[in-house]
Amino acid sequence: MLKTPLYESHIAANAKMVDFSGWSMPINYGSQIQEHNNVREDCGIFDVSHMLAVDIQGSEAEKFLRYLLANDIAKLQENKAQYGCMLNHDAGIVDDLITYKVTDEHFRIVVNAGNRESDVAWFNQNAQNFDVAITPQTDLAIVAVQGPKAVAVIKRVVTKEIAAEIEALLPFSFKFFSKWMVARTGYTGEDGFEVILPATQVKKFWDSLLENGAQPAGLGARDTLRLEAGMHLYGADMDTSTTPLERGLGWSVDLSDEHRDFIGKKAYLAKKAQGVDTKWVGVVLKTKGVLRAGQEIDFDNGEKGYITSGSFSPTLKVAIGLAYVPKQADNPVVNIRGKELEVELVKPKFVKNGKSLI
C-alpha cells in the first residue's frame, strides 16, 4: 500500500489507518466527532498528500486548459484558483479539481487521489496537439490547515513577513514562497489553507503546527465536514456516468465564450437543451437514524430519488445527505430497518463557517 511522507507521524499518533484509493491513510486519531468539531471551532490539520499536484507549462498552457476543462481558465488572474470539472466526450465527469494560475504559461492542477493515474493519462492523451509539458509533482506533500483559528496557527510557524502575506490572501488566491505554495482553499466549509510543499520538509511543518495549537484530523472528519459544506466527493456523488447538470454543478461550466470548444461541450449542450428530470438536493432526516449512500428516497407519486452521500452531522446533530430526486415529487421518506421515516429536502449546503444554513 502507498504511504505519504507523514505515515510514521500518523502511526506515532495512534491513528486508525485505512486503505483509501490504495493509500494507507488516517481515518481518525481517536474521536472522529471531536476532530470534526475542532475544525469547526478551532484548527485542524489534514494530511492530503495522497492527492497529486500536476504542473502544466508551456506557450499553449492556457489554450490547452481552455480545451481540457469545462470552466474557463482564461478568466483567471495570476495567483488565483478556480474550481471546475474535467469532462469526457459524453460530458461525463472525469474528475473535479482546482486549477491554480501561476503565470500565463504555468498552471498547477490538484487532482483527487483515486484519479491520479487516470487524470495524468487523460491530460497526456489530450495534450498531443498543444505545446505543453505535463509534470506530476510526486515529490511534493499537501497539508490542509482548516478552521476559524487556522490563520492564528499558521502565523505562529512562519516568519512575520510571510505571516502577513498569508493572512492577506483572499479566498481562492494563493502565493508561492520559494518551493512552498500556500492557497486559501479547503474542503471543509471553514476558513483555512492548503499548503503544497516539498515532501522532505513536511514532517517539520506538521510537527510545528501541532506544537502551535493545531490538532490532527483524519479522513472521517474530512468527509463529514465536506458533506456539511455541500461539497461533492468524486466517485460517490458523481463520476463519468453523470454530467454537471445532474449534480448541481452547472454553474462551474462556462459557456460565455461561444467560440471556445472544450471536451464534452457538444454533449453537454445537447443534455442542457434536453433538460434533466432530476434535481440536486440536501436531505435532512427528521427523526433518529442514519442516512447512507445508496438509500432510496420514496415519494407519494411512486417516483424515487437516491442518496449519494450520507452521515450523521456532528454540527447539526441530525443525519444529512446529498441526493438526486425527481423535480416534481412530494412527501419524501426513506426506509430504514423496515420503517418509513420522513426526510426534508433542502438546499445542498448545510453549514458555512460553523453556522447552520438549514
Curated annotation (Swiss-Prot):
EC numbers, comma separated: 2.1.2.10
Keyword Transferase tagged: yes
GO molecular function terms listed in the Swiss-Prot or TrEMBL record: aminomethyltransferase activity; transaminase activity
InterPro entries reported for this sequence: GCS_T, GCS_T_bac, GCST_C, GCV_T_N, GcvT/YgfZ/DmdA, GcvT/YgfZ_C, TrmE/GcvT_dom1
Pfam families linked: GCV_T, GCV_T_C
Single Gene Ontology BP annotation: glycine decarboxylation via glycine cleavage system
Keywords: Aminotransferase, Transferase
Keyword Transcription regulation: no
One GO cellular component term: cytosol
Catalytic activity: N(6)-[(R)-S(8)-aminomethyldihydrolipoyl]-L-lysyl-[protein] + (6S)-5,6,7,8-tetrahydrofolate = N(6)-[(R)-dihydrolipoyl]-L-lysyl-[protein] + (6R)-5,10-methylene-5,6,7,8-tetrahydrofolate + NH4(+)
Group of enzyme by EC: transferase
Xref: PANTHER family: AMINOMETHYLTRANSFERASE, AMINOMETHYLTRANSFERASE, MITOCHONDRIAL
Family the entry assigns: Belongs to the GcvT family.
Function in brief: The glycine cleavage system catalyzes the degradation of glycine.
Subunit and interaction comment: The glycine cleavage system is composed of four proteins: P, T, L and H.
Protein's UniProt name: Aminomethyltransferase
